């Protein structure tokens, strides 16, 4: 038991089992969500535009990060080391891809540039190159020990410091960059919208609702990284202050929210109107008519929704005529 407590930083074997189960379950959800976006990109040609290509790379990084979080086993040396390096590499790549999406949106909307597709090679060099560099630097502080269910975290003071500098420092740099960038984009669009309202007497309410929905969606993007890694950052700082004492509930929140990052990204970035439209069109082609009624309204093909509404209107008219005759 003493060996378990030492390796787990004060956690019991039961605590470690619970955290491991949470990590596996949350990582599996992220893997499925990210794999779904990757599959949609591969199957639907209409999604292979530059903007969604960046989302594809983000989902691919999340998928591989989630996969290695699942397969890591602290009881097996080689697999443990492999998980530590690959998880670090792909998790860093994931939040770096979010900065390229923010940069692309800012360059297009705020600076009115149309050359973003020419920057794809630079994006790859920036994301994969930076991820490789910080992963190699992290190996210098690797003391070949693990903490809890993850082979990714370190127990030694030097390992903790290097881990913080090579992951959490660039992570919060990306969060600050994304937040500032989306703030500028949203402010730019809102100012343009006010000018449009001032120049016209009538504004399409439907367009307004759609624009506000998009603006609100962009505002949530930086919150995904904050929600995924805030508890992990607090836990790492706590490890510095009290290295021999682990807080169980904080470890649960750390592992659970971090492992769900891929799922959050797949929903926010990937499951957009273009993806839903592509799915609707395939459902309309292959799904039998009798199964439409069992689908939620937002998943039904558009033509079927129109037909369903027309049928409802006709049935209401028939019932009204019947009442009038009576």
UniProtKB/Swiss-Prot annotation:
It is a multi-pass membrane protein. Keywords: Abscisic acid signaling pathway, Acetylation, Brassinosteroid signaling pathway, Cell cycle, Cell membrane, Cytokinin signaling pathway, Disulfide bond, G-protein coupled receptor, Gibberellin signaling pathway, Glycoprotein, Lipid metabolism, Membrane, Receptor, Transducer, Transmembrane, Transmembrane helix. Mostly present in the meristematic regions. Expressed at low levels in seedlings, vascular tissues of cotyledons, hypocotyl, and roots, stems, leaves, flowering buds and siliques. In dark-grown seedlings, localized in the cotyledons and the hook. One of its GO terms (biological process) is response to cytokinin. Pfam families: Dicty_CAR. Induction: Modulated during the cell cycle with a peak during the early G(1) phase. Disruption phenotype: Improved drought tolerance accompanied by lower rates of water loss. Impaired sensitivity to gibberellin (GA) and brassinosteroid (BR) in seed germination. Hypersensitivity to ABA and glucose (Glc) during and after seed germination. Altered response to blue light (BL). Residues 45-51, 106-120, 182-213, 268-326 are cytoplasmic. GO terms for cellular component: Golgi apparatus; plant-type vacuole; plasma membrane. Glycans are attached at residue 143. Residues 2-23, 73-84, 142-160, 235-246 are extracellular. The chain crosses the membrane at residues 24-44, 52-72, 85-105, 121-141, 161-181, 214-234, 247-267. The modification N-acetylserine is found at residue 2. One of its GO terms (molecular function) is G protein-coupled receptor activity. Disulfide bonds join 80-151. It is found in: Cell membrane. It comes from the Eukaryota. Interacts with GPA1. Together with GPA1, may regulate the cell cycle via a signaling cascade that uses phosphatidylinositol-specific phospholipase C (PI-PLC) as an effector and inositol 1,4,5-trisphosphate(IP(3)) as a second messenger. Promotes PI-PLC activity and IP(3) accumulation. Involved in the blue light (BL) signaling. Together with GPA1 and ADT3, required for BL-mediated synthesis of phenylpyruvate and subsequently of phenylalanine (Phe), in etiolated seedlings. Probably involved in cytokinin signal transduction. Belongs to the G-protein coupled receptor 2 family. This is G-protein coupled receptor 1. It comes from Arabidopsis thaliana. The lineage of its organism: Eukaryota, Viridiplantae, Streptophyta, Embryophyta, Tracheophyta. The gene is GCR1.
């Amino acid at each position: 038991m003493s060996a378990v407590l030492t390796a787990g930083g004060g956690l019991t074997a039961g605590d470690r089992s619970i955290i491991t189960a949470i990590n596996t379950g949350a990582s599996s959800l992220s893997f499925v969500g990210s794999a779904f976006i990757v599959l949609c990109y591969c199957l639907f040609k209409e999604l292979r535009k530059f903007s969604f290509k960046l989302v594809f790379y983000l989902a691919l990084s999340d998928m591989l990060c989630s996969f290695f979080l699942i397969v890591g086993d602290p009881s097996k040396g080689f697999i443990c080391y492999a998980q530590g390096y690959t998880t670090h590499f792909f998790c860093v790549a994931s939040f770096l891809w979010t900065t390229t999406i923010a940069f692309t949106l800012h360059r297009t909307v705020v600076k009115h540039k149309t050359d973003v597709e020419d920057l794809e090679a630079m994006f790859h060099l920036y994301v994969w190159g930076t991820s490789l560099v910080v992963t190699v630097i992290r190996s210098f502080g690797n003391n070949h020990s693990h903490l809890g269910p993850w082979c990714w975290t370190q127990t030694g003071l030097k390992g903790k410091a290097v881990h913080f500098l090579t992951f959490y420092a660039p992570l919060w740099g990306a969060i600050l960059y994304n937040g500032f960038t989306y703030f500028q984009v949203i402010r730019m669009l809102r100012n343009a919208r006010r000018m449009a309202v001032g120049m016209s007497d009538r504004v399409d309410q439907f367009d307004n609702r759609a624009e506000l929905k998009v603006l609100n969606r962009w505002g949530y993007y930086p919150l995904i990284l904050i929600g995924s890694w805030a508890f992990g950052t607090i836990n790492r700082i706590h490890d510095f202050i009290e290295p021999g004492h682990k807080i169980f509930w904080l470890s649960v929140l750390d592992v659970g929210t971090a492992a769900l990052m891929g799922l959050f990204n797949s929903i926010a970035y990937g499951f957009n109107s273009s993806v839903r439209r592509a799915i609707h069109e395939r459902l309309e082609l292959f799904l039998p008519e009798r199964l439409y009624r069992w689908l939620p309204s937002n998943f039904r093909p558009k033509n079927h929704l129109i037909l369903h509404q027309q049928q409802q209107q006709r049935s209401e008219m028939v019932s009204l005529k019947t009442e009038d005759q009576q």
